[in-house]
Protein backbone atom coordinates (compact mmCIF):
# COMPACT_ATOMS: atom_id res chain seq x y z
CA UNK A 1 0.00 0.00 0.00
CA UNK A 2 2.73 2.45 0.97
CA UNK A 3 4.83 1.69 -2.09
CA UNK A 4 2.06 1.80 -4.71
CA UNK A 5 -1.21 3.24 -3.44
CA UNK A 6 0.07 6.10 -1.29
CA UNK A 7 2.42 7.17 -4.08
CA UNK A 8 -0.43 7.21 -6.62
CA UNK A 9 1.01 4.41 -8.75
CA UNK A 10 -1.89 2.04 -8.04
CA UNK A 11 -5.40 2.06 -6.69
CA UNK A 12 -6.75 -0.28 -4.01
CA UNK A 13 -10.44 -1.19 -4.09
CA UNK A 14 -11.89 -3.50 -1.44
CA UNK A 15 -14.91 -5.60 -2.36
CA UNK A 16 -16.81 -8.08 -0.26
CA UNK A 17 -17.10 -11.70 -1.31
CA UNK A 18 -19.66 -13.10 1.12
CA UNK A 19 -19.84 -16.69 -0.02
CA UNK A 20 -19.91 -18.68 3.21
CA UNK A 21 -23.58 -18.31 4.06
CA UNK A 22 -25.67 -15.81 5.97
CA UNK A 23 -23.08 -14.87 8.58
CA UNK A 24 -20.50 -13.79 6.01
CA UNK A 25 -23.15 -11.60 4.40
CA UNK A 26 -24.08 -10.04 7.73
CA UNK A 27 -20.41 -9.44 8.53
CA UNK A 28 -19.94 -7.65 5.20
CA UNK A 29 -23.05 -5.55 5.82
CA UNK A 30 -21.78 -4.75 9.32
CA UNK A 31 -18.43 -3.62 7.90
CA UNK A 32 -20.31 -1.26 5.58
CA UNK A 33 -22.29 0.06 8.55
CA UNK A 34 -18.97 0.67 10.34
CA UNK A 35 -17.71 2.42 7.22
CA UNK A 36 -20.62 4.86 7.54
CA UNK A 37 -18.88 5.93 10.78
CA UNK A 38 -15.40 5.96 9.19
CA UNK A 39 -14.42 2.75 10.99
CA UNK A 40 -14.33 0.24 8.14
CA UNK A 41 -10.75 -0.95 8.58
CA UNK A 42 -10.94 -1.06 12.37
CA UNK A 43 -14.10 -3.17 12.14
CA UNK A 44 -12.70 -5.33 9.32
CA UNK A 45 -9.54 -6.05 11.30
CA UNK A 46 -11.56 -6.78 14.45
CA UNK A 47 -13.63 -9.38 12.58
CA UNK A 48 -10.61 -11.11 11.08
CA UNK A 49 -8.74 -11.14 14.40
CA UNK A 50 -11.82 -12.43 16.22
CA UNK A 51 -12.42 -15.32 13.83
CA UNK A 52 -8.73 -16.22 13.83
CA UNK A 53 -8.25 -16.08 17.60
CA UNK A 54 -11.48 -17.84 18.54
CA UNK A 55 -11.78 -20.41 15.78
CA UNK A 56 -9.10 -20.93 13.14
CA UNK A 57 -6.13 -20.77 15.53
CA UNK A 58 -7.87 -23.49 17.55
CA UNK A 59 -8.43 -25.69 14.51
CA UNK A 60 -12.17 -24.98 14.43
CA UNK A 61 -14.34 -23.66 11.63
CA UNK A 62 -15.96 -20.34 12.36
CA UNK A 63 -18.34 -20.59 9.45
CA UNK A 64 -22.01 -20.11 10.32
CA UNK A 65 -21.65 -21.21 13.93
CA UNK A 66 -22.77 -17.91 15.44
CA UNK A 67 -19.42 -16.12 15.39
CA UNK A 68 -20.86 -13.41 13.15
CA UNK A 69 -24.45 -13.55 14.33
CA UNK A 70 -26.00 -10.10 14.34
CA UNK A 71 -25.86 -9.82 18.14
CA UNK A 72 -22.11 -10.45 18.05
CA UNK A 73 -21.61 -7.99 15.20
CA UNK A 74 -23.40 -5.35 17.29
CA UNK A 75 -21.23 -6.18 20.31
CA UNK A 76 -18.10 -5.76 18.19
CA UNK A 77 -19.30 -2.30 17.13
CA UNK A 78 -19.74 -1.35 20.78
CA UNK A 79 -16.27 -2.74 21.60
CA UNK A 80 -14.83 -0.41 18.95
CA UNK A 81 -16.70 2.63 20.27
CA UNK A 82 -19.04 3.07 17.32
CA UNK A 83 -22.35 4.86 17.77
CA UNK A 84 -24.31 1.70 18.52
CA UNK A 85 -27.75 3.20 17.91
CA UNK A 86 -26.73 4.16 14.37
CA UNK A 87 -24.83 0.94 13.78
CA UNK A 88 -27.61 -1.33 15.05
CA UNK A 89 -30.24 0.51 13.03
CA UNK A 90 -28.06 0.24 9.93
CA UNK A 91 -27.44 -3.48 10.37
CA UNK A 92 -31.08 -4.26 11.21
CA UNK A 93 -32.29 -2.35 8.17
CA UNK A 94 -30.43 -4.54 5.68
CA UNK A 95 -29.39 -1.30 4.00
CA UNK A 96 -26.26 -2.84 2.46
CA UNK A 97 -27.57 -6.35 1.71
CA UNK A 98 -28.10 -5.68 -1.99
CA UNK A 99 -24.67 -4.05 -2.37
CA UNK A 100 -22.96 -7.03 -0.70
CA UNK A 101 -24.91 -9.49 -2.87
CA UNK A 102 -23.96 -7.51 -5.98
CA UNK A 103 -20.26 -7.45 -5.11
CA UNK A 104 -20.34 -11.18 -4.37
CA UNK A 105 -22.02 -11.96 -7.69
CA UNK A 106 -19.55 -9.74 -9.57
CA UNK A 107 -16.74 -11.66 -7.90
CA UNK A 108 -18.23 -14.98 -9.01
CA UNK A 109 -18.58 -13.71 -12.56
CA UNK A 110 -14.94 -12.63 -12.50
CA UNK A 111 -13.82 -16.11 -11.47
CA UNK A 112 -13.46 -15.67 -7.72
CA UNK A 113 -14.28 -18.83 -5.77
CA UNK A 114 -12.70 -18.08 -2.40
CA UNK A 115 -10.85 -15.52 -0.34
CA UNK A 116 -8.52 -13.84 -0.39
CA UNK A 117 -8.73 -12.95 -4.06
CA UNK A 118 -6.95 -10.00 -5.60
CA UNK A 119 -7.01 -8.53 -9.07
CA UNK A 120 -4.02 -6.69 -10.47
CA UNK A 121 -4.84 -5.02 -13.77
CA UNK A 122 -7.61 -7.56 -14.37
CA UNK A 123 -5.49 -10.61 -13.51
CA UNK A 124 -6.80 -12.78 -10.66
CA UNK A 125 -4.38 -13.73 -7.91
CA UNK A 126 -6.16 -16.34 -5.82
CA UNK A 127 -5.35 -17.23 -2.24
CA UNK A 128 -2.90 -15.94 0.31
CA UNK A 129 0.33 -15.37 -1.57
CA UNK A 130 3.63 -13.73 -0.62
CA UNK A 131 3.92 -9.98 -1.11
CA UNK A 132 6.62 -10.60 -3.71
CA UNK A 133 3.98 -12.15 -5.99
CA UNK A 134 1.78 -9.05 -5.70
CA UNK A 135 4.78 -6.82 -6.21
CA UNK A 136 5.76 -8.65 -9.40
CA UNK A 137 2.19 -8.39 -10.74
CA UNK A 138 1.97 -4.67 -9.95
CA UNK A 139 5.40 -3.98 -11.45
CA UNK A 140 4.42 -5.88 -14.61
CA UNK A 141 1.18 -3.88 -14.87
CA UNK A 142 3.04 -0.60 -14.37
CA UNK A 143 5.52 -1.50 -17.10
CA UNK A 144 2.69 -2.30 -19.50
CA UNK A 145 2.96 -6.08 -19.30
CA UNK A 146 0.02 -8.09 -18.04
Predicted regions mapped to residue ranges:
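C-terminal cap of thioredoxin/glutaredoxin-like
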Residues: 1-6, 65-146
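Structural alpha/beta surface segment adjacent to cysteine/selenocysteine redox centers
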Residues: 1-78, 110, 140-141
Amino acid sequence: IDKYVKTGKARFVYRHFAFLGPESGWAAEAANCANAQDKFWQYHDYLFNYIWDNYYAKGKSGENVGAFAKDNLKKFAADLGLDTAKFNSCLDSGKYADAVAKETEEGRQAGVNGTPATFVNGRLISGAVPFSQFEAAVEAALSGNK
